[in-house]
Amino acid sequence: MKVDEREITVFQGEYKTSPLIVLNTVQGEGEEIHKITKELSASDFTLLSVQIDDWNSAMTPWRAEAAASWDSGYEGKADEYIKSLTQRIIPGVIVRYSLCPSFIAIAGYSLGGLFALYSMYRTDIFTRFASVSGSLWYPGFAEYTEKNIPSASPDRIYISLGNKEAKTGNRIM
C-alpha cells in the first residue's frame, strides 16, 4: 500500500491492542526483520514498515555536507516526513486495521536511528524509541539534544552504537 508516495507494509499482530512499531527501511527489509523478531520474542506486536527511498533526505533533521566521499550529502527533510508519518501514515494504518495499540514505538538503523531519536523532539506520538547503530555523529545533533526538550515523555529508549565508527579516519564519525 502507498501513502504519501511511500510504500508501507503492515505485519499485523494477533491483537488490536498489540504495540505498533514503526520501522523505516531502505532496502525493504521489514518482512525479514519481522520474521526474525517474531522467532526471537514471545511479545506480540504490529510492525509498520515504511520504505524510505530518499534516505539521506527524509532521515536527516537539517542539511549537512556528505560525511564520506561516496555519499551525496544530506537534505534535512525529517520534519516533512515526521508530518506525513504522524498525520497520515500512522493514523491511516490505525483506522484501516482497526488498531488500538497499547503504545507506538519507532525504530531505525543508521540514519533511521538518528531519525528515531530526533522524532522524540518533534512529536509525542511515540513513547518508545530504538536507535540501532544510529548516526548520532550527525553534525549538530548532540548540541540539538542539549538545547531542546523532548516532545515525548519516553517510556523506554534503546541505543546501540556500532564499533566501526571509532575505527574510521573520518573525524565526523
Label each residue range with its predicted role.
Residues 7-9, 15-96:
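Serine-hydrolase catalytic machinery in alpha/beta-hydrolase-like enzymes
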Residues 81, 110-113:
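Active-site loop->helix "elbow" adjoining a glycine-rich segment at hydrolase catalytic centers
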Residues 98-109, 129:
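Alpha/beta-hydrolase fold nucleophile elbow
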Residues 113-123:
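Short glycine-enriched nucleophile-adjacent loop
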